[in-house]
Amino acid sequence: MKAIFIFLFLVLLFSCQSSEEKQLEKVLTLSGNNRSALEKVLEHYKENEADSLKLRAAKFLIMNMPGHQSYTGKDIEEYYVEAEKIIFSDRKIDEQVNELNNLLLEFPSDDFEFKEDYSVIKASYLIQSIDAAFDDWQQGRWARGITFEDFCEYMLPYKCVEFQAFDDWRNVLKPIANDTLCDFSYNDIWNKTPYHAAEAINIKLRDTVIVDLKKPLKWHALYKVPFWCNMPSNSCETRTNTALAIMRSKGFAVSYDFVLQWPTKAHAHSWLSILIDHDRRMVCEGGHDPFLATLRP
């Protein structure tokens, strides 16, 4: 009887382990010619036993890559070039919107080539992103109390929005609004919770992510350095994605949330959900004040 119990236990243990390994192998197979890049990431973290948690994080990202895509090809690159000329010109903001809308006639979004992330992502980018996320979690001030599982969901992702370009977004966005946190190290209460820091940054972002336009930007593919804080868009989706990237670059555990339609009106809406400890979240709109007061720590 004891032997049967041990046998069943080993079978169960093996099946649980193989399920994860099967999913990992499935993605590695789907990655085709890019398999060596993904395997390089895994091997990198296998070299040092101290990186065992980073290895788990790498597996988590790779196993969840199916369904996540990125633009590739010359059309999107040409679109970026033309968009940069418009956005960083001396034109008034409404003129920029008109020109960006007209640019979509020359570069229709349906014509942009895209591929699954697992087939194009580079090992160096993924390793850099994982290391940066771990530094923010373990060495930063605003997410020390969250679990590894929450870390994987709220901080680890290598991009913040679908079709975001693979670039150095964390380091580029990290300095934004840092002046608002200069005095926090002298206040024990403010320095021990992400609530007040996130609130201060969110207020500071008002001039960064909120734009007054006469005519809306119809659509864009500008989630890329150097466009992040320069997009002439007043949509809550763009505002929320930008604020999300900025908050995450600073080491806040944050996610994107939305409703497709309100029960009383025909509109969608989106907002940020910031994890302030292992079981409490605060909700805010990027650049808007105040936060929900009932969620104060």
Predicted regions span which residues?
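Hydrophobic/aromatic-rich core segments of domains that either
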Residues: 23-32, 44-49, 184-204, 213-226, ...
